[in-house]
UniProtKB/Swiss-Prot annotation:
Name of the encoding gene: rplW
NCBIfam families: PRK05738.1-3, PRK05738.2-4, PRK05738.3-2
Family (UniProt): Belongs to the universal ribosomal protein uL23 family.
Species of origin: Geobacter metallireducens (strain ATCC 53774 / DSM 7210 / GS-15)
Coiled coil: none
Keyword Kinase: no
Alphabetical GO biological process terms: translation
Quaternary organization: Part of the 50S ribosomal subunit. Contacts protein L29, and trigger factor when it is bound to the ribosome.
Protein name in the entry: Large ribosomal subunit protein uL23
Keywords annotated in UniProt: Ribonucleoprotein, Ribosomal protein, RNA-binding, rRNA-binding
Function summary: One of the early assembly proteins it binds 23S rRNA. One of the proteins that surrounds the polypeptide exit tunnel on the outside of the ribosome. Forms the main docking site for trigger factor binding to the ribosome.
CC per GO annotation: ribonucleoprotein complex; ribosome
Length: 94
């Protein structure tokens, strides 16, 4: 699997910004079939940083309603990537 297929997009929210500042953790939406080793290798190769830990969460899609019709958003996977001391990724800086 290509590294650009594994990492879909960074998650930039208030919570993830605080985690980045306090714990040096960055968050990504990743491919549902990707494992922790593939995620670690993709982040290290793409951003040229050293990763110490990867935690993943499978997020269930929500039920949404439009009028009287129901639909379901897709399930997705979130990855919390902890970087080693001295490493950082600057694309979160606004």
């Amino acid at each position: 699997m290509n590294i650009y297929d594994i990492l879909k997009k960074p998650l930039v929210t208030e919570k993830t910004t605080l985690e980045k500042d306090a714990k040096n953790v960055i968050s990504f939406e990743v491919d549902r079939s990707a494992n922790k080793i593939e995620i670690k290798n993709a982040v290290e190769k793409l951003f040229k940083v050293e990763v110490s830990e990867v935690n993943t969460v499978n997020v269930a899609g929500k039920l949404k309603r439009v009028g009287r019709h129901y639909g379901k958003r897709s399930n997705w996977k979130k990855a919390y990537v902890t970087l080693k001391e001295g490493n950082n990724v600057d694309f979160f800086e606004i």
